[in-house]
């Protein structure tokens, strides 16, 4: 079946003007995740912020109670004992000047980037490469740290970084279609709670305006915010 026809058929039974309780929304999304691969289940939260203003930026990291179902490749910029600590914790790529040169050469063999504080002057050279990908280490989300083992294990264990985009939207994967509905609901609530707690001082009016869930290839289902938050 062509992608367009599949998507049209998958929209059947979904009222685009209705807000569904999160449990029902997840069930509907799972039922429509019929691709041959294990689709990612995603959440999109429209927030009442304008990220062009520094006091309205929303970002953070949260460890989902049931993981993401995805194996992240973790890169660590560290030297000496901290480099060995990172390797022992399961980091996929560890280095210093050599790793900077590799990344500058166009090879990024990791999905999450962690650095010790002393490495940041060096890692700062990679801002134009890592920044647009949302991979630049940042102390606010725990990716610039001396606890490299904890950061690596957190990334491998299901931690998700979130950051509001230009349109005021936070999007994140919260599991796989193969997860039980209960586990997906728990993950949604954990991420939504973290986003709620990250409300910036400059936010005015209604903070969480709309929530929707979807699968990689499926339609979005609008969610009643009250069934997710609180």
Swiss-Prot record:
Q: Which Pfam families match?
A: Ribosomal_L1
- Please provide one cellular component term from the Gene Ontology annotations of this protein: cytosolic large ribosomal subunit
Q: Which CDD domains match?
A: Ribosomal_L1
Read off the lineage from the record.
Bacteria, Pseudomonadati, Pseudomonadota, Alphaproteobacteria, Hyphomicrobiales
The Swiss-Prot or TrEMBL record describes its family as follows: Belongs to the universal ribosomal protein uL1 family.
Outline what the protein does: Binds directly to 23S rRNA. The L1 stalk is quite mobile in the ribosome, and is involved in E site tRNA release. Protein L1 is also a translational repressor protein, it controls the translation of the L11 operon by binding to its mRNA.
Q: Which InterPro entries match?
A: Ribosom_uL1_bac-type, Ribosomal_uL1, Ribosomal_uL1-like, Ribosomal_uL1/biogenesis, Ribosomal_uL1_3-a/b-sand, Ribosomal_uL1_CS
Looking at the record's lineage, which domain of life comes first? Bacteria
* UniProt source species: Nitrobacter winogradskyi (strain ATCC 25391 / DSM 10237 / CIP 104748 / NCIMB 11846 / Nb-255)
Protein name (Swiss-Prot/TrEMBL): Large ribosomal subunit protein uL1
Gene assigned in the entry: rplA
Record text on subunit structure and interactions: Part of the 50S ribosomal subunit.
Which UniProt keywords are given for this protein, alphabetically ordered?
Repressor, Ribonucleoprotein, Ribosomal protein, RNA-binding, rRNA-binding, Translation regulation, tRNA-binding
According to its UniProt entry, the protein's GO biological process terms are: regulation of translation; translation
GO molecular function annotations of the record:
rRNA binding; structural constituent of ribosome; tRNA binding
């Amino acid at each position: 079946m062509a992608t367009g026809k599949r998507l049209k058929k998958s929209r059947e039974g979904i009222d685009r003007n209705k807000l569904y309780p999160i449990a029902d929304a997840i069930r509907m999304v799972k039922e429509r995740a019929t691709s041959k691969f294990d689709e990612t289940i995603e959440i999109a939260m429209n927030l009442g912020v304008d990220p062009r203003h520094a006091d309205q930026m929303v970002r953070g990291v949260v460890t989902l109670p049931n993981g993401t179902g995805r194996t992240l490749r973790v890169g660590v910029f560290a030297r000496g004992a901290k480099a060995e600590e990172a390797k022992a914790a399961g980091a996929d790529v560890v280095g210093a000047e050599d790793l900077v040169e590799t990344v500058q050469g166009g090879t990024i063999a990791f999905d999450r980037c962690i650095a010790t504080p002393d490495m940041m002057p060096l890692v700062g050279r990679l801002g134009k490469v890592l920044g647009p990908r949302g991979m630049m280490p940042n102390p606010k989300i725990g990716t610039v740290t001396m606890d490299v083992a904890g950061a690596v294990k957190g990334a491998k264990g299901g931690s998700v970084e979130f950051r509001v985009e230009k349109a005021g939207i936070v999007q994140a994967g919260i599991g796989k279609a193969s997860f039980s509905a209960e586990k997906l609901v728990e993950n949604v609530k954990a991420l939504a709670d973290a986003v709620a707690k990250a409300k910036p001082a400059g936010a005015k009016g209604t903070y969480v305006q709309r929530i929707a869930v979807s699968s990689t290839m499926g339609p979005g289902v609008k969610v009643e915010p009250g069934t997710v938050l609180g």
